Amino acid sequence: HIETVQKIFKELYDKGYIYKGEYKGKYCTPCESFWTESQLIDGKCPECGREVTEAKEEAYFFKMSPFADRIEKLLTETDYLQPKTRAVELVNNFIKPGLEDLCVSRTTFKWGIPVTFDEKHIVYVWIDALSNYISALGYKNEKFDEFDKYWPADVHMVAKDIMRFHAIIWPAMLMALDLPLPKHLAVHGWITFNGQKMSKSLGNVVDPFVLGERYGADAIRYHIMREMALGADSSFSNEIMINRINSDLANGLGNLVSRTVAMVQKYFGGTLPTERESGEFDDDLIETATSLRAKVDDFMDKTQLQNALAEIFKLVSRANKYIDETAPWVIAKDETKKARLATVLYNLLEAIRIACTLLSAFMPTTMPKALEQIGA
């Protein structure tokens, strides 16, 4: 990582995108830190609470303005940023007022990656931290290079509080390096607790390890993705989670699998005969099942995980309804309708197979077990 960051910094400097200038700001002498006006608390250092003074520091800057038009078009004219509603916020707040050049080095501290051609300067957070995404893949590293194999990323997912860094600064860096951008930038909201932001001081932080031990990681993963729409905050509560797990996973999918497997075992000893006989209600279930993958693919491409899961559970609900409509236990009483009974159960098994296969992306531990139950 260190070597890659130094090479990136030098390349940007050689291309004329990085230049030496002067950084001005509020300086805290005890903390040896510069702060912006907005970072101060009551005009004082946000870390130690002491007075700050106006100070200047020699620094290197990264030119942002050459990329303003390209980034604005990227955000407003393509599907790069998801959800799209975030684009207006970024353009109005940061691009329209004019992108300021970015301070990318400091001399007031020594911990960090030194600039190779001016070692009193330490590479500041932007080029250091953001470069992790490509340094980890071996970018500009002769000994280890997986970069071409894995870059560009299909989806780069970040939280809303760091959206600006990844929607404006990171694309500008990549453009300056003549590297492809991630195909999509997905911005998610925060998980709140009963509508409040989680905070240790409030004692409302949810421990995912405790939840995982109690309900299973797959169930927690499912609940979060089912309840959280991309870009919006989601309120977590034990009551909502338990209701969702019970209604969808236990009563919905779990009940469908157990009823179907039990009937296949009871009426055919666990193996269906090959004879088939179509009947009423088949077409609607088959259409719901066969059209599902394309719908889920579309939602997944848009990073709309909540909608993808909702679509899958439409099939689960339709299959449960199909059981009530066809009443296999009634058909089983007529020995001449073995083919019809086998068809009904086959349709149910196929619906389960499709639903569980698509759900495997969300619940990778549980769904293979469900597929094993039906012999898939």
Name these PLM-found stretches.
Residues 1-18, 32, 173:
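N-terminal Rossmann-like or analogous alpha/beta NTP/dinucleotide-binding catalytic cores
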Residues 3-4, 30, 48, 54-266, ...:
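Structured secondary-structure scaffolds
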Residues 11, 27, 44, 102:
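The −1 position to Zn-ligating cysteines in a subset of zinc-ribbon hairpins
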Residues 20, 227, 240-277, 288-376:
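Helix-rich, typically C-terminal accessory recognition domains appended to large enzymatic cores
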Residues 22-23, 40, 59:
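Flanking scaffold residues of small Cys/His-coordinated metal-binding clusters
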Residues 25-31:
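Short, conserved phosphate-binding/catalytic loop or strand-edge motifs used
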Residues 35, 52:
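Cys/His-rich microdomains that often coordinate metals
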Residues 41-50:
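Cysteine-rich micro-motifs
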